[in-house]
Curated annotation (Swiss-Prot):
GO terms for cellular component: cytoplasm; Holliday junction helicase complex; Holliday junction resolvase complex. Residues 64-142 are annotated as: Domain II. The RuvA-RuvB-RuvC complex processes Holliday junction (HJ) DNA during genetic recombination and DNA repair, while the RuvA-RuvB complex plays an important role in the rescue of blocked DNA replication forks via replication fork reversal (RFR). RuvA specifically binds to HJ cruciform DNA, conferring on it an open structure. The RuvB hexamer acts as an ATP-dependent pump, pulling dsDNA into and through the RuvAB complex. HJ branch migration allows RuvC to scan DNA until it finds its consensus sequence, where it cleaves and resolves the cruciform DNA. The keyword NADP does not apply. Residues 143-150 are annotated as: Flexible linker. Has three domains with a flexible linker between the domains II and III and assumes an 'L' shape. Domain III is highly mobile and contacts RuvB. Signal peptide: none annotated. Residues 150-203 are annotated as: Domain III. The keyword DNA repair applies. Homotetramer. Forms an RuvA(8)-RuvB(12)-Holliday junction (HJ) complex. HJ DNA is sandwiched between 2 RuvA tetramers; dsDNA enters through RuvA and exits via RuvB. An RuvB hexamer assembles on each DNA strand where it exits the tetramer. Each RuvB hexamer is contacted by two RuvA subunits (via domain III) on 2 adjacent RuvB subunits; this complex drives branch migration. In the full resolvosome a probable DNA-RuvA(4)-RuvB(12)-RuvC(2) complex forms which resolves the HJ. One of its GO terms (molecular function) is four-way junction helicase activity. Residues 1-63 are annotated as: Domain I. This is Holliday junction branch migration complex subunit RuvA.
Length: 203
């Protein structure tokens, strides 16, 4: 079982990244929050969990243990597989998922692609008592970071991530600039998610 990877980030795609470790490239599927913390050509460490099927072995990557545990926990719900668990973490932070489930907010959970009313209610029933403590398990680095002005480093890093995801700088920069101007308190991962949301509506 591969539980973590440390190596050079070779490429970043729309939903995955390739990390080379000792000459071997591993494709890791991940949510935008995780991909947004990676930079091509730089060293990175990601926590992983492997999902084994009859014809495939797939690695999923995370920036912190709380996110990885939530990914595994979500799959304990009948009918909720790894793709849906990853979709949940692409829409919400681990903290948000725990809060929506604990609060019985089925309407919020239905914002996850592929989750209807019945699945949302099942998630609440099955996991309401199991998400206690998840908010406390998220490291400070993963919490929203407040700032008074737009951090230039955040803009540069998010722009690089967007270009790595296949968007041209000409298209991505105006969208990202607007996102950060309207919400300068956003962290890198939050800004990436917001920019991807806007860029997605333009396709």
């Amino acid at each position: 079982m591969i539980v973590s990877l440390r190596g050079t980030v070779e490429s970043i795609g729309l939903g995955s990244a390739v990390i080379e470790c000792n000459g071997v490239g591993y494709e890791v599927l991940a949510a935008p929050t995780t991909l947004g913390r990676l930079t091509r050509g730089e060293q990175a460490r990601v926590l992983t969990t492997m999902v084994v099927r009859e014809e495939s072995q797939t690695l999923y990557g995370f920036t912190d243990d709380a996110s990885r545990r939530m990914f595994v926990l979500l799959q304990s719900v009948s009918g909720l597989g790894p793709k849906l668990a990853l979709a949940a973490q692409s829409v919400f932070t681990t903290e948000d998922i725990a809060r929506h489930i604990a609060g019985g907010d089925a309407k919020a959970l239905q914002k996850i692609p592929g989750v209807g009313k019945r699945m949302a209610e099942r998630m609440i029933v099955d996991l309401k008592d199991k998400v206690v403590g998840f908010n406390d398990g998220i490291p400070a680095a993963a919490q929203p970071q407040l700032s008074i002005a737009v951090d230039q480093a955040v803009q540069e890093q998010v722009l690089e991530a967007l270009v790595g995801l296949g968007f041209s700088e000409k298209i991505a920069l105006p969208v990202l600039s607007r996102v950060l101007r309207d919400s300068p308190e956003l962290s890198k991962s939050q800004a990436l998610r917001a920019a991807l949301s806007e860029l997605g509506t333009k396709n």
